[in-house]
Design a protein with these regions (language model features):
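Beta-strand-rich domain onsets/edges
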Residues: 26-36, 109-167, 172, 176, ...
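Glycine-centered loop-to-beta-strand initiation motif
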Residues: 76-79, 192-206
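Short, threonine-centered small-residue motifs that mark membrane-proximal processing/anchoring sites
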Residues: 25, 238-249
Length: 269
């Protein structure tokens, strides 16, 4: 009885933040750096944190026609960078942040899948998966979805935005429109209208990555009670996939931010 009551309490404590602020979990995104694309982890408005590079699972590069461009993956002790072997117009990536068990309210611990299976009968366990999409060009094929499990879809060309204009975005789960995702930009949540659209404002200096999250309850998973997807979207002109990129700097890019490099790897969702 005690374990059941404790489990219910922890479940409520774990779900409450998802209701009032479900975008608290970290995201990944790309940051162009002298020919390489650093894979950053954290909250874009706060800066990046160190992470275990083994959690980075895959990356795909695309040219202007959405054909695959080979990429080299460089893993450092607490980060990953990607080097395209040609001009790219888009990058996507997948990061499995693993299982987190909540043993007390507000305190989560990163555990292995086998440990999660042992703990799950008595404690709330979540599995956190991260995806990201970065555009460096725009075309008829690039504006179509890339097939990410959770994906932010821009409904107009972000490179044509002017200061004060809004970028309409939708969030897709398994290719289908979500009506109730959490969309966040610079730490602020944005309202989703009846068509599943959020309007993200352009600000002088460009965009931070836009974030979205969606959480599912799991009934038959021995290791986790819920599956949490986090995804991000960014756009900037770093590669030169089309001649128009030579006309000037992009109106849409990542804002400069101070990276918070941790002294050690953190157990962060």
């Amino acid at each position: 009885m005690f374990k059941k009551s404790l489990r219910q309490l922890l479940l409520a404590a774990a779900i409450f933040p998802l209701v009032v602020q479900p975008a608290m979990a970290h995201v990944i995104w790309f940051d162009y750096n002298k020919g390489e694309y650093d894979v950053l982890f954290g909250h874009p408005e706060d800066g990046a944190e160190a992470y275990n590079p083994d959690k980075f699972k895959s990356v795909t590069g695309y040219d202007q026609n959405k054909q695959i461009v080979p990429v080299e993956i460089k893993k450092q002790s607490e980060s990953v960078s990607v080097i395209p072997q040609g001009d790219i117009a888009a990058l996507t990536a997948f990061f499995d942040n693993g299982f987190f068990v909540t043993k007390s309210p507000g305190n989560s611990e990163n555990v292995s899948e086998s440990e999660a299976e042992k703990l799950n009968p008595d404690f709330e366990v979540g599995h956190f998966l991260k995806h990201t999409k970065a555009l460096y060009g725009w075309s008829e094929v690039l504006k179509q979805p890339f097939g990410l499990p959770l994906e932010i879809q821009a409904l107009k060309n972000p490179f044509e935005l002017k200061s004060g204009e809004l970028l309409p975005v939708q969030v897709l789960y398994q290719g289908n429109l979500l009506k109730n995702p959490t969309v966040e930009y610079e730490g602020e949540k944005y309202t989703i209208d009846e068509d599943g659209i959020a309007l993200v404002p352009y600000v002088v200096g460009g965009f931070q990555p836009i974030e979205a999250s969606y959480t599912l309850s799991l009934d038959n998973d021995p290791a986790a009670d819920r599956l949490s997807y986090e995804t991000s979207f960014s756009a900037e002109r770093n590669s030169v996939p089309e001649p128009s990129a030579l006309l000037g700097l992009s109106v849409l890019g990542l804002m400069a931010f101070a990276r918070k490099q941790g002294k050690g790897l953190k157990s962060t969702k």
